[in-house]
Amino acid sequence: TTEIEPLTQKSLFNARKQVNKIHMSEAVEEYLVQLILATRNSRAYSGELGQWLDYGASPRATIALDKCSRALAWMEGRDFVTPDDIRAVAHDVLRHRLILSFEAEAGGINANQVIDKLLETVPSA
């Protein structure tokens, strides 16, 4: 059997430094920002999104989406973020940060479905 060694504080801090160095191109960064903006001004992007969202994601969601997509790229051995990285973490990052409308909830629409529509609506880099 393989012995698992505990994670040290030093190795955790080193990993954090490496993740922060992961490159995100301007085009990919713009895609990330547009996803967040689409939650705040949803009617401009899609009538359905406009009906489903009362409140969109906060500035902290932008930061979390950025950090999580960089971390995923790092864990996959890349030194750059792709739109696929952003899409891969979007549900986990945004699910609890969106306030759905009464219409959405009454219609059986959940946050995952709203995020699916968001990813389908906002063009990627």
Regions found by a protein language model. Name each.
Residues 17, 41-125:
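C-terminal engagement/docking regions of AAA+ P-loop ATPases
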Residues 1-44:
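Phosphate-sensing "switch" segment of ASCE/P-loop ATPases
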